[in-house]
Regions:
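Carbohydrate-binding surface patches
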Residues: 5, 406-449, 487
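Active-site groove signature of glycoside hydrolases
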Residues: 125-133, 223-256
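Catalytic cores of secreted or luminal carbohydrate-active enzymes
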Residues: 354-405
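C-terminal beta-strand-rich structural cap/linker in extracellular carbohydrate-active enzymes
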Residues: 464-492
Length: 492
């Protein structure tokens, strides 16, 4: 009660689980508060035979006496250093370009190469081929499960394209949606019982697709098999693992009626088995999960995925709230954030390139528009953005995050990233709504060494830590969608 971003007592509860859950608080007749989080009991039963064990998901409880910010920083450090694992845990990630918002399903090898050439010119390090490369996948109604290259689009196959991308000096990444199946696919023709479904009922589609039944060993073997084959036989450095719908009609043809309430949890156990197998077999592949459109971004996924596409809404101004809210528990190093098109392809908002870049730099930085059409001016600006991203990424990804201005409460957003030794601070500020003759907005920093002096790299000005925290920096909000990034270095 009464807790704020930087003050008050906060109790945080987070579940290391990717399945159905329930969380809540209640007060009993003696005015005692109770908080709970765990597996959702709705439609869940589990037969536990003599001698068997059942392991419930872990709940991670955090106490903070320094408000929501203190809670978040505890979660960030804990999950980044103790839950995340693997080759990339303590490394900065490559700057990537993804073709999805540039082409959707309509592309060929020449188009992808054209995007990659401009990406390389700008300094991008990884080219990702998204949805549409397999089967007869020309829209979202078909071919999930048919994981072989579309010869019309890619006459030289995945391997041929990947070699050309690598020949440009880029790494190559590939999109999959391994957990899904299209009713219009060769896989469904052969195995119509392989999807999650309730016997005797119509199978309801989400995004024109069904979910594979991961409770089945044959389905898990199939997924592990095709992923292993493609990763072994092609120079792939990155996998984007999508998940575009959630559950309906939960049931499995493999379980008897009295055990159908085990399906949802068994699915998650099956998913974890697949992810454990694949990520262990290919430790040098960077794996990125996707929160949209199935709405799955949780600590259970963080154990397997190096980073996560935070939302399919890539509009920079919308992302201020999305990334702010996600940061309550998830660290910046986990949040995929890309520079999208001008205007944005779905919101049609005109956000300057500078601001789109700044917003993306507060997460895992990349690009998501048609680079093949980029002008020399755009390429030059991209080079500057990538250079700035490289300069600040270690502080953003491995430092402490302080939320200073909430986009939910003000017409701006401010976030500070502070290195562990407090020697370097990165301040991001964005105005979402300009004002005529408005008073300056002061952004007060946090976590600094108050007795030391900090020099601003961009302006050359020197401030004490106490002044930066108690008075702050003044910003004029003279126009919409303007942003700033300032870097501060503690003086010896």
């Amino acid at each position: 009660k009464g807790a704020r971003e930087n003050s008050g007592e906060v109790f945080g509860f987070s579940l290391v689980y990717s399945g159905n859950f329930v969380a809540g608080t209640e007060v009993n007749e003696f005015h005692i508060s109770r908080a709970f989080i765990g597996m959702n009991p709705f439609d869940f039963n589990w037969r536990l035979n003599p001698g068997e064990t059942f392991t419930a998901p872990e709940a991670v409880m955090v106490y903070s006496g320094k408000g929501f910010g203190g809670m978040s920083r505890t979660y960030h450090r804990l999950y980044r250093t103790r839950l995340a694992r693997g080759t990339f845990r303590d490394k900065n990630r490559p700057v990537l370009a993804n073709n999805w918002e540039a082409t959707t399903f309509q592309f060929n090898e020449d188009k992808i190469i054209a995007i990659a050439q401009k990406a390389k010119e700008a300094g991008v390090e990884l080219m990702v081929l998204d949805d549409g490369w397999f089967g007869n996948r020309n829209d979202d109604t078909t071919s999930l499960g048919d994981w072989f290259p579309n010869q019309e689009k890619l006459p030289n196959g995945i391997g041929g394209l990947a070699e050309k991308i690598e020949g440009l000096g880029l790494k190559f990444g590939l999109w999959f949606e391994p957990e899904m199946i299209s009713p219009e696919s060769k896989l469904y023709e052969m195995h119509p019982d392989w999807c999650i479904h309730a016997e005797g009922r119509e199978r309801n589609l989400g995004r024109q697709q069904l979910i594979l039944d991961l409770t089945r060993q044959d389905v898990r073997d199939f997924i592990i098999g095709f992923l292993t084959d493609i990763l072994k036989n092609n120079p792939i450095s990155y996998i984007k693992w999508d998940y575009n719908r959630n559950f309906t009609d939960i049931g499995s043809a493999m379980l008897p009626p009295e055990r159908q309430s085990e399906v949802a949890h068994r699915y998650i156990l099956g998913l974890y088995e697949i992810l454990e197998t694949i990520t262990t077999a290919f430790p040098n592949v960077l794996f990125e999960g996707c929160a949209s459109g199935g709405g799955r971004f949780d600590p259970g996924q963080m154990y397997y995925f190096d980073q996560y596409w935070t939302s399919d809404n890539s509009d920079a101004i919308a992302r201020l709230k999305i990334q702010y809210g996600t940061s309550l528990v998830m660290p910046a190093i986990m949040q995929g954030a890309h520079v999208s098109a001008y205007p944005h392809h779905s919101l049609h908002r005109f956000v300057p390139m500078k601001t789109r870049g700044h917003v993306a730099m507060t997460g895992q930085f990349g690009y998501e528009f048609d680079l093949s059409k980029a002008t020399d001016e755009t390429i030059a600006e991209m080079k500057e953005q990538i250079a700035l991203s490289k300069k600040i990424e270690s502080v953003v990804h491995f430092g402490d995050m302080y939320r200073l201005d909430s986009p939910f409460e003000t017409d701006c957003s401010s976030v500070e990233f502070l290195s562990e030794d407090k020697n370097t601070a990165v301040l991001f500020h964005c105005c979402t709504l300009g004002k005529i003759n408005g008073a300056p907005h002061f952004v007060k920093m946090s976590g600094l060494d108050r007795a030391s002096e900090y020099a601003c790299e961009e302006t050359g000005e020197v401030f004490s830590g106490a002044v930066l925290e108690d008075v702050g920096l003044a910003f004029r909000h003279s126009k919409d969608f303007e942003s700033w990034i300032y870097i501060f270095h503690k003086q010896k």
